[in-house]
């Protein structure tokens, strides 16, 4: 479904099963794996006796320290504009492109940042808030496309 929606409706494309099931690139499995990765980090955080709150999570996020953290925050800030444009133009591929760019921004942040091993509690809480916000945004976006994320892959 994601593979179909990620292509501009007015353009021809070749159905390629290998591309649609790949865990790399702008594909459904890549997006879903990113969401599952975030859920896994949050579950590990909870296992250490910490609580993840959904409400007001944005208030815990500190100003960005690194390049990838800032890039993730900037990508999150584009949400309203992308959703409005996607619906106004009946262009689900634009929402898919945003989802892919957000997943890429998260994965860069994940590779650059030791989220769970951060020693400063306020910084760690900020990271947890940021990835909680990212997970929620990704799940809302795929939900708009009629897709649900699994708990595990």
Predicted features and spans:
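Non-catalytic interaction-recognition regions
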Residues: 1-153
